[in-house]
């Protein structure tokens, strides 16, 4: 039997603060002075999600492709900035390449899902495009950041080995190939682990959201399968593209290592 989603109001948000207060009190009891940090994080959580809620309500009411694309562009830009800051905040050119890499990988996987599987009445339907992009982009941002940071660290820590390969005639791509494969493999471990335990240990956002909204649990499970495979493909594409971009930051036009 399906029931409508129980709506929460501002008074309920006040009660939610009790959860934050309990966490702060427990940490203070353990001698961890994280009160300011947690209050700041909690305040940002409330403010950001309330603003996003109102903003998305406006976008949904407009039903305009340009409004939807603006939202996606903002999400992509923030993801690229966060990934750049994790990998190499001093690089000026890395942001643009990350923006293209994350955007292209997300567009490829989402395009397949929308055209072949979901087939919404309008390609820009915000009901599907915005939440799907948000779930996928958040995951691929983390995977790309992990792969890029791991590869950058490996190059910085092993300059002699890389230069030895270069002296023996290897190209930059060949010289760092083992580090790149290790970085891609490490970045995909969380995704694979999540796929192994989904439905057993954790109930992901798409599934729980539809069930809470009164949707059919089986249909929600099918949508979650789609999300998991979309995340896998997008993470794979983005880590391949990002690592290819990152290692080129460490070589000049003469194929010399810059570390």
From Swiss-Prot:
The chain crosses the membrane at residues 4-24, 34-54, 55-75, 98-118, 128-148, 195-215, 225-245. It comes from the Bacteria. It is found in: Cell membrane. Its main location: membrane. GO terms for cellular component: plasma membrane. Coiled coil: none annotated. Keywords: Cell membrane, Membrane, Transmembrane, Transmembrane helix. Disulfide bonds: none annotated. It is a multi-pass membrane protein. Belongs to the UPF0014 family. This is UPF0014 membrane protein slr1647. The lineage of its organism: Bacteria, Bacillati, Cyanobacteriota, Cyanophyceae, Synechococcales.
């Amino acid at each position: 039997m399906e029931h409508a989603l129980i709506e929460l109001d501002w008074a309920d948000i006040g009660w939610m603060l009790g959860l934050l207060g309990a966490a702060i009190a427990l940490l203070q009891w353990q001698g961890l002075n994280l009160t300011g940090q947690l209050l700041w994080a909690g305040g940002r959580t409330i403010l950001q999600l309330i603003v996003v809620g109102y903003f998305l309500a406006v976008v949904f009411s407009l039903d305009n492709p340009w409004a939807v694309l603006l939202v996606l562009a903002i999400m992509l830009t923030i993801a690229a900035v966060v990934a750049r800051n994790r990998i190499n905040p001093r690089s000026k050119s890395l942001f643009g390449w990350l923006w293209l890499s994350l955007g292209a990988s997300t567009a490829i996987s989402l395009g397949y899902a929308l055209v072949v599987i979901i087939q919404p009445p309008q390609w820009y339907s915000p009901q599907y495009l915005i939440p799907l992009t948000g779930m996928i982009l958040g995951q691929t941002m983390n995977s790309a950041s992990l792969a890029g940071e791991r590869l950058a660290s490996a190059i910085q820590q092993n300059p002699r080995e890389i230069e030895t390969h270069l002296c023996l005639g290897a190209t930059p791509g060949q010289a760092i190939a083992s580090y790149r494969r290790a970085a891609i493999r490490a970045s995909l471990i969380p995704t694979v682990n999540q796929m192994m335990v989904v439905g057993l240990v954790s109930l992901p956002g798409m599934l729980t959201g539809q069930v809470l909204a009164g949707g059919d649990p089986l249909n929600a499970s099918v949508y979650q399968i789609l999300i998991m495979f979309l995340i896998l493909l997008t993470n794979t594409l983005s880590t391949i593209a990002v690592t290819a971009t990152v290692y080129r930051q460490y070589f000049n036009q003469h194929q010399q290592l810059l570390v």
